[in-house]
């Protein structure tokens, strides 16, 4: 019941946690490390050969110069065999005594760092600093020099073959073996170039500035603080003035660019407005109004003066346009009235002999009819004048309203100006002519009836 899924899967051959797979991986790793060591040995051998070859060249050996050195040297395999024989003849050093006659595998023969467990006893791959023996540390009770300092350990009688217990020698041996003490333990025995050995000023020595400040009174300190505050304020003011100057320069450049554009547009608009249309004048006024909102007070005053002048010119133009529009109408009315009067005179000449034969009563009737006809003849002229007056009054009222609207909204100027213009189609003019003719013909018919 207590077995888990991992325990079940580790027994499978394909699972990486199985014992067979772990063993295979470990064996492969050991073989790779063995091959690497072989390659390193070959490289070291090659480097030694090169060094010897270079030394011989420096010494001036003729064999090396002629390239015949290979004939007088033994092959590399012979040297290895000789070394192995020497090692077997001499006593090899082992970490532990039980390793002397113990059998080992090929991959573990030359490697002394591999941990072994003979007879199930755990072997520690550790070396003591004091007695230089493997299997324990200087803090273990197994060490014969346990509980003794370096000086006392050096005074203990030991064999001549044993290592010395002097602390400097111990530190050197530790470094050679790959160990090192902490800096806190070493203390002052370090070199003079070490940064921890630099000269540090004591607390008693104080800076001259601090001493000067301590010697001052409270009033003098307050004065110093005030001076420092003033200097800081001056620096801040200088910075703010520089920023303001930069902003003013940028604004002036921007204004100059904008003033150039509306001046050119206003000149073009004035030339076009004097020629034909009032729409160009409205566009120039809108441009000036936009530029005045962004410019300063001085520019606003100048633009106001320009506006007044333009308004005067516009009023004169509108009046002249109204007069021009009214002139052709008046001419038409005068022509119509003159034509009607000529016709009436011709008809009267034909009727005079008939009227003389008739009595005095008919004379009185003709005189009355002449008065009525004259009144009717003069009536269209009066009507035309009345119409012209009404049109002029309307155009003036609309012009005033358009001026007010321009000051308020420049975008509706065009629409209102188009409305203010009194346009009449040719059909309407023909109707007006027919109406005047019908009035004249009606008068003549009445005369004939009478």
Curated annotation (Swiss-Prot):
Description of post-translational modifications: Phosphorylated by NEK6.
Keywords assigned by UniProt?
Answer: Cytoplasm, Cytoskeleton, Isopeptide bond, mRNA processing, mRNA splicing, Nucleus, Phosphoprotein, Repressor, Transcription, Transcription regulation, Ubl conjugation
Covalent link location (Glycyl lysine isopeptide (Lys-Gly) (interchain with G-Cter in SUMO2))? 79, 354
In chain numbering, motif Nuclear localization signal lies across 235-247, 307-314
Residues annotated with Phosphoserine modification? 202
Region annotation Interaction with RBPJ: where it falls in the sequence: 1-121
Highest rank taxon of the organism: Eukaryota
**In its keyword annotation, does this UniProt entry include DNA repair?**
no
The record's principal subcellular location, in a coarse class, is nucleus
Q: Where is the composition biased (Basic residues)?
A: 233-260, 303-313, 404-424
Q: Where is the composition biased (Low complexity)?
A: 261-294
Q: Which InterPro entries match?
A: CIR1, CIR_N_dom
Q: Which GO terms describe its biological process?
A: in utero embryonic development; mRNA processing; negative regulation of DNA-templated transcription; negative regulation of transcription by RNA polymerase II; positive regulation of transcription by RNA polymerase II; RNA splicing
Pfam families xrefs = Cir_N
**Region of interest (Disordered), residue spans:** 218-450
Question: Keyword Ubl conjugation on this protein?
Answer: yes
In this chain, composition skew of type Basic and acidic residues spans 314-329, 340-354, 425-450
The region called Interaction with RP9 is annotated at 204-232
Subcellular location(s) of the protein: Nucleus speckle; Cytoplasm, Cytoskeleton, Microtubule organizing center, Centrosome
Q: What would be an example GO MF term here?
A: transcription corepressor activity
GO CC annotations? centrosome; cytoplasm; nuclear speck; nucleus; protein-containing complex
Q: Could you describe the subunit structure of this protein?
A: Interacts with RP9, SNW1, SFRS1, SFRS2,U2AF1, RBPJ, SAP30, HDAC2 NKAP and NEK6. Interacts with Epstein-Barr virus RPMS1. Component of the histone deacetylase complex. Component of the Notch corepressor complex. Interacts with NKAPL.
Summarizing the function annotation, the protein's role is:
Regulates transcription and acts as a corepressor for RBPJ. Recruits RBPJ to the Sin3-histone deacetylase complex (HDAC). Required for RBPJ-mediated repression of transcription. May modulate splice site selection during alternative splicing of pre-mRNAs.
Q: What is this protein called?
A: Corepressor interacting with RBPJ 1
UniProt lineage = Eukaryota, Metazoa, Chordata, Craniata, Vertebrata
